[in-house]
Amino acid sequence: MQLIDGRPVYAATDLVGFLACGHRLALERAAMHGLVEKPIRNDPSIDLIAKRGLEHEGRYLDDLRAEGRLVVAIEKDGSAVAPAGTTNGAPAPWDAGAELRAAADQTLDAMRGGADVVYQATFFDGAWRGHADFLLRRDHAPGEPDSAFGPWHYEVADTKLARHV
């Protein structure tokens, strides 16, 4: 959960946390508003798992490109967003809402354009945000109705190392 444009924006992990313990969400909201301090975890084993996960994801991305698929990577480094308010050459404050909206727009543009693969797809409606490692284009069989994008749709492909979530 994060505060964007003055409102809380939730992600799937927030929903999972709430289902596990409703009090956890209340603590997260309190930390977001500065009422309590959020605990910081420093666990080298989690860092190692994250590193291996990113390496695995990178290999999968390389495999998709090697197959000749058109891959559109959604940028999340803020380069697509130039927030207003820079003065005297100082950088403007990071605008998470603008970055999420830009990434979600890039995702929809890639899907409408018929990309074979959308890497790091982003979804954002102002209240919820989500990310998919990969969206894979699936062409429709003859006679199947078109989706909002055309005679194809997209399926989510996740590259988690775990077998179960």
Question: Which sequence ranges carry the predicted segments?
Answer:
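Metal-dependent nuclease catalytic cores that hydrolyze phosphodiester bonds in DNA/RNA
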Residues: 1-151
